């Protein structure tokens, strides 16, 4: 259901920002990853035509992979992101610009 999914995603973003403010003074960073269209079971019901249309809407012209999301998570959990908190990293190929 699109409504439930969208509401839950918005809640996670709000929780991320609130926790970042609350836990920042303790040196704890809180971020979230908000992927776009990714080639997973969630989209398995879509036919090739629908997937091609989604890819075409994306400025990079492709559907993301689970590896794209994993790389975003890796970055946020690495020392490279030690000064990043309260952010939403969106590996979405530019779909949401």
Give short role names for the model-derived ranges:
Residues 25, 35, 78:
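Short, conserved catalytic or interaction motifs in soluble domains
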Residues 13, 30-45:
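Short, flexible catalytic-loop segment of classical short-chain dehydrogenase/reductase
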Residues 44-58:
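A short C-terminal helix-loop "cap" of Rossmann-like NAD(P)-dependent dehydrogenase/epimerase domains
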Residues 32, 55-80, 84, 91-93:
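C-terminal helical subdomain
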Residues 21-25, 82:
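Alpha-helical segment proximal to the catalytic Tyr-Lys
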Residues 8, 16:
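Active-site helix of classical SDR
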């Amino acid at each position: 259901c699109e409504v439930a999914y969208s509401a839950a995603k918005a809640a996670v973003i709000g929780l991320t920002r609130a926790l970042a403010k609350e836990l920042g003074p303790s040196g704890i960073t809180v971020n979230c990853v908000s992927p776009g269209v990714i080639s997973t079971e969630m989209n398995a019901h879509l036919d090739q035509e629908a997937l091609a249309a989604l890819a075409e809407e994306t400025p990079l012209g492709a559907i993301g992979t689970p590896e794209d999301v994993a790389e975003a998570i890796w970055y946020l959990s690495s020392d490279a992101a030690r000064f990043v908190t309260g952010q939403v990293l969106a590996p979405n190929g530019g779909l949401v610009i």
